[in-house]
Amino acid sequence: MHDLMMTAVQGDADAAYQLGYLYETGDGVPQDEKEALRWYSMGAQKGHSKAQFNLAVMLEEGRGQVTDLRKAFFWYEKAAQQGESNAQYNLALFCTLGKGCEVDLVLAHMWFSLAARKGSSDAIHNRDAVAKQLKAEQLALSQQWVAQWIEKNAVAKS
């Protein structure tokens, strides 16, 4: 445990994520949501997508601190941009409901579409429900954004 903490303090994002998870679940350490939040935050700031997602969930649910939907939106977006499908789904919900942001059904459709690519039946259902509320040009814009996101991320991975 000491080695993991030292590695995290030295800037290792994965070690910080692992510590956040241990403190969140109480696996081998006393459960402590404030500590989990602290370690997830450290990992998130270093770009660890799972730390970003878990931090967003805790911020959304008010675990370890007061609920902060704007910050939750921010971290869901960071994780979603890295391809975390659960973050893409949650971000789409935020855009649909106006949680931590203005309602934006075009953006919601885009994120539901990306999450649906991983086979999420909820994402598929919600994408289709949102599509029914969009005008043809809005749907085309969302589909254009999806294609651009896929292309950008394919280039980034190569």
State each model region's role.
Residues 1-25:
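N-terminal segments that cap or nucleate solenoid repeat domains
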Residues 9-13, 25-27, 32, 45-49, ...:
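Short helix-capping/linker turns of helical repeat alpha-solenoids
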Residues 18-25, 29, 54-61, 65, ...:
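Hydrophobic face of amphipathic alpha-helices that form TPR/SEL1-like repeat modules
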Residues 121-158:
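Terminal, low-structured helical/coil segments at or just beyond the last alpha-helical repeat
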